[in-house]
Structure formats: structure tokens, C-alpha cells
Amino acid sequence: MLIYKDILTGDEIISDSYNLKEIDGVVYEADCTKITVGGESFDTGANASAEEQEEGAEDSAETKIDVVYSFRLNETGFDKKGYLTYLKGYMKAVKDGLKKKGADEATIKDFETKASGYAKKIISNFKDYEFFTGESMNPDGMIVLLNYREDGVTPYVTVWKHGLEEMKV
């Protein structure tokens, strides 16, 4: 199994157990599912029907997005201007990371061109996205984007391909 970590923070972002689709050569998208966590009730007595029913047990159950829950991502917020400011700094950091890894100029130029194009897509649909940081909540790390498919039901995440490094487990 491969786990993809943020190259800037080391936070685990996603794994290959999700069907990652490369989009425009610059991001991965992965469909998610909604899961229910919490709300479990365990009867420990011999006669469960005679025990008092605990009220409110169902209230503690929450619906979460599996990727967000599994990788302990934290919701954050942005306005359009704030996101653009963040994205500019993040792209520079990823570009520097590519240089440190020894990427050639053509690869870096390709990344810049494709990232700029995809950023325009994000901004044009900005109001549709939810934003998540990695577990460390480091503001310089990757912001994972959550949106819903055209059916309005299926959530999916978008992560920057060049901002990830593989870790085999």
C-alpha cells in the first residue's frame, strides 16, 4: 500500500486504497464515501432487554467523509482572496521542493503552467469547495479540496500531485 504524504509537512493526505484519478497532469481526484462514526452502544449485561435504554446514543453518531476522517484532516476556511494568497505561496514552496529533488526546468515549467490552469478552475467554482488542512494543521502545507460530483451526492477530494511524496507501507 502507498500512502501519499505532504512534501512540506509530512502529513498523510491520502492512500492508494482510494481510486486516484490524475486530472490535467497536476492534481489527483478521489471519490469518497460518507461514513457514520460514533453512536455505538454496547449491552454488557446478561439481559439486555431488561436494561434501561440509554437515551441520546444515536445523537453521538456523526456522518463524516471517509478520507477526511481516516487521515484526520481538519476543516478550515478561506475567502477567495485569502485562498489565492495561500496558493501563490504554496505553489512557490512546491516549485522549490521540485528543484531540491533535482527536477529539470521542463518539469518545473510544466508544473507551473498546469497548476496555473487548474487554479483558474478552482477559482471559477470557489464557492463549491470545502477546505481541509493536514493533521498538523500547518498553514503552509497542502490544502485538500472537497467538492461534490454532478449528482450532488458523491463527495470527492482534490490534491496537488506535485505536493505529494509516496511512502510504501
Curated annotation (Swiss-Prot):
Function in brief: Involved in protein synthesis. Involved in microtubule stabilization.
Organism expressing this protein natively: Alternaria alternata
The entry's keywords: Allergen, Cytoplasm, Cytoskeleton, Microtubule, Protein biosynthesis
GO biological process terms, semicolon-separated: cytoplasmic translation; negative regulation of microtubule depolymerization
Subcellular location(s) per record: Cytoplasm, Cytoskeleton
A GO molecular-function annotation: calcium ion binding
Protein name per its UniProtKB record: Translationally-controlled tumor protein homolog
Gene Ontology CC terms, in alphabetical order: cytosol; microtubule
Residue span(s) of domain TCTP: 1-169
Family note: Belongs to the TCTP family.
Gene3D superfamilies in UniProt: Metal Binding Protein, Guanine Nucleotide Exchange Factor, Chain A
The keyword Signal is annotated on this UniProt entry: no
Pfam families for this protein: TCTP (PF00838)
